[in-house]
Amino acid sequence: MSRLTHELRRAKWELRVAGRRTAKRRFRRRPDMPTLFGCAMAKSGSHALSQLLEGLAAITDLIYTDMHPIRTRLPQIGARSSEEVLRDLGRLRRGDIGWGYLPAIPTYLDALADPRWYVLFLSRDPRDKLISEIHYALRMHPKHGFREHLLSLPTMEERISASISGVPGIIKGIAGIYESYQGWLSHPRTRVVRFEDLILERGRALTTLVEDLGRAGVQTHVPQAEALRSLDAAMSPSKSPTFRSARPGGWRAEFTARNVMEFKQATGDLLQRWGYETDKDWAL
């Protein structure tokens, strides 16, 4: 994507959102309506997050402004400045829904600390995310920066090892990736939703979210039971063009005992900090 293409798409976005705001009588709504921002890591269930946000727009006065995420890097352009990313965030008004892949650096943490923001962060088991990234690079993204290196490795065990440790100049190790997002877990405006809960405990997870949004000033148009049915129907991970498997714990079929040892050595207490294990004694 060229920078000109990106700017043209942005101009179309402004026109589209203006129409949606008018259609929902945007300026007659309560001034305490939050701005909802969904945040995730790549290959951590972000399509499920997008479906959830779209479902919320259907049952509330929130406006899903753009299905395209806010990114810190763009294809064929490369890294974007934090100022460019902040401008994208600044276009979101109260009552808007946006989403993106934003690491937890002070610039973004501070920008979204304002009381008008409601940050919905989607987390996923690092082991499942790692496997998902490998299959995505090999099967679905011919231009993925990690693909050539993965293809040079003869076994899945070695590919997992490389993903755990990282490859200098190509990809971060899994610990570094999660460290760069960990600040969202303790951010004052953030509510964390686990991808696993959206798959295995969806009713409970959606109920908790809808009730919390209500306390934040976002009311549903319909009774809660109907709202929850609507949200449940909106979520179908298999409809994602990059879908492979939404089954939590699928890493167990791919890791070897060696990979488990390498993961523990490389990540320390990462799984405990993210709530995926209670201690370091986990195994296949």
Task: Describe every region a protein language model picked out.
Residues Q219-A227, G275-L284:
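Short, flexible loop/turn segments with low-complexity composition
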Residues L153-R159, R202:
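Acidic, glycine-rich loop-and-strand cores that form catalytic or ligand-binding grooves
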Residues L62-S82, S186-M261, Q265:
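The conserved 3'-phosphoadenosine-5'-phosphosulfate
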Residues S2-L153, S163-V193, A266, Q272-D279, ...:
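PAPS-dependent sulfotransferase catalytic domain
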Residues G95, P154-T155, S230, A246:
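Helix N-terminus capping/helix-initiation residues
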